[in-house]
Regions:
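Active-site microenvironments in enzyme catalytic cores
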Residues: 6-172
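Catalytic-pocket segment enriched in acidic/His residues
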Residues: 124-253
Length: 253
């Protein structure tokens, strides 16, 4: 669909295959062969948190103010987890957090056609040790979740009116909760998508996570068994349990 015209998505959602999900059926991440990218340091609070975790390195301060945004690959095609699928924390990390984000879905020409909810699960201890470890802190098995569905831009609220809410639960109780406004983002959504499409071909389109302003305190780290719930105005709620990702396996296993 994302390799075609913008109207294709609306036609598909209005077609005979559309309808409620059968009870008990698993819900996958609402993407197919699209890669998931992410933008970093798009909110002031995110910049401050990255500076704190990185012992005062000023690279994050510079990218917050720069014309060119930070963009990185978050999940290979087919790797994002859907609703109620487990997200992972690395066994070789001791500080892991969810990053609740508005995800924009763009077609092959870079036109934003839909929104969904994204969770950019991250190892702050690995990234904080050295910024060059960013791919290991961000891109690993079960580090990305998307869902619960795609909402076409024609049916979604204006992003300026969207609010992101995060709740982390442990042992059935609320451990942490916070919320932020998408309107507080320093960069615009079309600006971020434009930078992503520069110099590369994305024939099936792409999903772009657009950053977060919700940063759990340093003493909080995700543990296996926790549950992460993210809600965005007009897009529903994405909920995922947390599991441990084994990092001791041999290559090729």
């Amino acid at each position: 669909v994302l390799g075609g015209d913008p109207d294709d998505l609306a036609e598909l959602l209005a077609g005979p295959a559309a309808g409620p999900v059968p009870e008990g059926a698993p819900v996958l991440a609402p993407v197919g062969g699209q890669p998931v990218w992410a933008a970093g340091v798009t909110f002031l609070r995110s910049r401050d948190a990255r500076l704190e975790e990185s012992s005062g390195l000023d690279a994050y301060d510079k990218v917050y103010l720069a014309e060119r945004p930070e963009l990185f690959l978050k999940a290979l095609p087919g790797a994002a987890r859907g609703p109620d699928r487990a997200i992972g924390v690395r066994a070789d990390s001791d500080w892991d957090v969810p990053e609740p984000e508005l995800a924009v879905v763009a077609d092959r020409r870079g036109r934003i056609v839909a929104y969904t909810i994204g969770d950019d699960v991250s190892s702050r201890s690995i990234e904080g040790e050295n910024p060059l470890y960013l791919p290991q802190a961000k891109l690993y098995r079960a580090s990305c979740a998307l869902g619960p569905c795609l909402v076409p831009v024609t049916e979604a609220p204006d992003p300026a009116d969207m609010e992101i809410a995060l709740v982390i639960e442990r042992d059935g109780a609320e451990l942490f909760a916070d919320r932020c406004a998408v309107a507080d983002m320093k960069r615009s959504l079309p600006e971020l998508v434009d930078w992503l499409w520069r110099g590369q071909d994305l024939p099936l389109g792409a999903v772009l996570l657009t950053g977060t302003s919700i940063v759990p305190p340093p003493e909080l780290t995700l543990r296996p068994g926790d549950r992460v719930r993210i809600a965005i105005t007009g897009l529903g709620e994405l909920a995922n349990p947390v599991e441990l990702v084994d990092t001791t396996g041999q290559p090729g296993r």
